[in-house]
Amino acid sequence: MDEFFGCCESLLAENGIFVTQFISIPEERYDEYRRSSDFIKEYIFPGGCLPSLTRITSAMSAASRLCIEHVENIGYHYYTTLIRWRDNFMANKDKILALGFDEKFIRTWEYYFIYCAAGFKSRTLGDYQIVFSRPGNTKMGSGF
């Protein structure tokens, strides 16, 4: 992550902003999660790893002079998004099967939507949006 933030800063205009959104796991679960496997890491995002908010901010501090202007956790709203995605997916099940996908594909993605929705509803997962800038950015708040 350090390299990521270093690259972002090097590409950012002096008075620019950088916005990112990421799914997160609580810091107290991060180390165990990183060393283990689960449904998502096995079937949906192989090789993926959810960061914690602390890991993101630590990497930012270590590799750049960026600062945080705003943080918002929209995870609870993401629950609704996933439920609607699932409903839309299932409403189009016949079309998906007609494309050549099988029932296992349908079950895998239905499980993914419900599994993730439960994580957001229980606040086991977060979905953060963070606005970064540089110290002294006089354009912040001026409508860019």
Each language-model region and where it sits:
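Internal amphipathic alpha-helical segments of the cytochrome P450 catalytic fold
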Residues: 1-2, 132
